[in-house]
A protein has these predicted regions:
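Extreme N-terminal leader/targeting segments of oxidoreductases
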Residues: 1-20, 78
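Glycine-rich dinucleotide-binding loop and its adjacent helix/turn
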Residues: 4, 126-179, 274-276
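Phosphate-coordination loops involved in phosphoryl transfer and adenosine-cofactor binding
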Residues: 17-19, 93-94, 156-158, 213, ...
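Beta1-alpha1 glycine-rich phosphate/pyrophosphate-binding loop at the start
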Residues: 18-87, 158, 168-196, 268
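Conserved phosphate-binding and hydrolysis motifs of nucleotide-dependent enzymes
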Residues: 24-29, 125, 164-166, 290
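A Rossmann-like FAD-binding core segment of flavoenzymes
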Residues: 84-103, 107-110, 114-115, 178-276, ...
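FAD-site-proximal beta/loop scaffold in flavoenzymes
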Residues: 132, 138-154, 251-302, 306, ...
Length: 321
């Protein structure tokens, strides 16, 4: 049987019927947990195998309100976790793997056990796509990132590169011109896939230098484990070069973490869960928060706000049962 853990290390069996189950423990899930717990709903948070969401791999967060000096991502997550637990939220490392919406009850599979819940908040997030190269996990937060808005300001007056060729890559590159001394845009094709207006802006930006028909084949860290350069290969000529950069911004998309809900809930063409009104899904009792439904902003503060909305809407729903 799966277990509920507390920060104190105690273990309890999972209840078979819950008022609220929250899937995910990033900013959205933990904010939902805080609000649901303060409403005396005793939410059960399924953290899964990688608790904390994307912030757990972020070093310094400077744009979350209330921290004028910034705060480490893992510390922010720990603070939110402790706050939720203080009000009565419970946590499990169990991972949601399936959803059954037949009948008048919601049934969620957590590892090897089926749980029933009156309300379900899905805040399972989205995972940035990376290149799958050696040392990738170690370098995330140390000169490798997928968010220029989050990390661009850390790289003032140094060269950086963006990997990708769509609108997201174009937006990242343009944003980084505010800080970096040079922005290399590495794309495996000979022209951008971005919309014409975005492509024109990139190609006319003085600080941006496109590198066409090229892929990154290796990250090169310095002796402190920080990014110092990338190895690139031209896909046409096979020529290999080393490009010194302080940070690599990978902008090749995100994958919403919706495997457990595939074919069960409405999604857009990219797989993001659809929200009908505020945080509500099409199915009664199921609410959605955070990056699993956000294909645009993907910020900690917007995730937290949607987590708040999901918990409040879940409380309203439960009060009407």
């Amino acid at each position: 049987m799966a277990e509920i853990r507390s920060l104190a290390g105690s273990m309890l069996p999972l209840a078979r019927m819950e008022k609220v189950i929250i899937v995910g423990s990033g900013c959205a899930g933990l904010t939902a947990a805080i609000y649901a717990a303060r409403a005396n709903l005793s939410p059960l948070v399924l953290e899964g195998r990688q608790p904390g969401g994307q912030l757990s791999t972020t070093t310094m967060v400077e744009n979350f309100p209330g921290f004028p000096e910034g705060i480490d991502g893992p510390q922010l997550i720990l603070n939110m976790h402790q706050q939720a637990e203080k009000f009565g939220a419970r946590f499990s490392y169990s991972e949601a793997t399936d959803l059954d919406m037949a009948g008048d009850r919601l049934r969620l599979r957590a590892d090897d056990e089926w749980l029933e819940t009156q309300a379900l908040i899905i805040a399972s997030g989205a995972s940035a796509r990376y290149l799958g190269l050696e040392n990738e996990e170690k370098l995330i937060g140390h000169g490798l990132t997928s968010c220029a808005t989050c990390d661009g300001a850390f790289y003032r007056n140094v060269p950086v590169c963006v990997v990708g060729g769509g609108d997201s890559a174009a937006e990242e590159a343009l944003f980084l011109t505010r800080f970096a001394s040079k922005v290399y845009l590495i794309h495996r094709r000979d022209q951008l896939r971005a919309s014409k207006i975005m492509a024109d802006r990139v190609l006319s930006a003085q600080k941006i230098e496109p590198i066409w028909n090229t892929i990154v084949t290796r990250y090169i860290p310095d002796d402190k484990g920080e990014m110092s350069a990338v190895e690139m290969r031209n896909v046409a000529t096979k020529e290999v070069k080393i490009l010194p950069v302080a940070c690599v911004f990978v902008a090749i998309g995100h994958d919403p973490n919706t495997k457990a809900f595939a074919g069960k809930l409405e999604t857009d063409p990219e797989g993001y869960l659809l929200v009908r009104h505020l945080a509500e899904s099409k199915h009664p009792g199921i609410f959605i928060a955070g990056d699993v439904a956000d294909r645009v902003y993907k910020q900690a503060v917007t995730a937290a706000g949607s987590g708040c909305a999901a918990a409040i809407e879940a409380e309203k729903y439960l009060s009407g049962l």
